[in-house]
Amino acid sequence: MPEGDAVFLTARRLDRALAGQQLTRTDFRWPSLATVSLAGATVLRTATHGKHLLTRMQHDGRELTLHTHLKMEGRWRTIDVGRKWPAPVQDVRVVLTSAQKEAVGFRLAIVELLPTADEHTVIGHLGPDLLATDWGEEHETEAVRRLLADPDRPLGEALLDQTTVAGIGTIWLAETCFVSGVNPLAPVTAVKDPVRLLRRARQMLRTAVKESRPVTTGDKRNPLWVYRRHREPCRRCGTTLVAGPIGDEGQQRTTYWCPSCQPEVGGDP
């Protein structure tokens, strides 16, 4: 599933193609919106909150938001008008066309149109967005409060829970826990400095946006410390990395760690 940085970069691409432009045609291949036309609407911008995309526009004197979510297989592509779509037609869920550019949403998991004033109904339950441009002390305090709300919960589960903080997926879970010296299966109480851990997660996400790809080691040739490096040597100590499931049965994800650098108890963020 695309994580917060990838969704943020998707929003940037949509903005480059459509922000400030008037839509000449729209096509919603989604049952609840099949008869909707937003032709004539002016796209303002696409914002994000964690893994959620919020394309805001003005139409007939109203401010509307197109809320989409990529989940596992969804993606947005922007192309010149008239160019062939880069994926099968049957996968198309949304088409937004301006005079020169077209944004096509493939296999989107969520597509809904709502008044911009009602965005809280679809993202209000989420934790603070680690890539929020106005991130400040208030966001950090709330993120820490949510993280510590269930101190016995496995840290990895808490970080993957978008109601704790928004934007972390399996990449940033594994990498944040590694650089913080905490095992992802350890309880939240194993984190000695939750503020520092969250700041590290935020900085890594910001770096990924800057580099347009996840890079946590500082080396673009070997960009990640532990993610998807099961059975490979730790880049720090040489110990063989391990992988294991995290989360409730039926919703388990795979995470990665170093048994030496990330003991099951303790940690030193």
Predicted regions and their residues:
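Structured catalytic/nucleic-acid-binding cores of DNA maintenance enzymes
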Residues: M1-P269
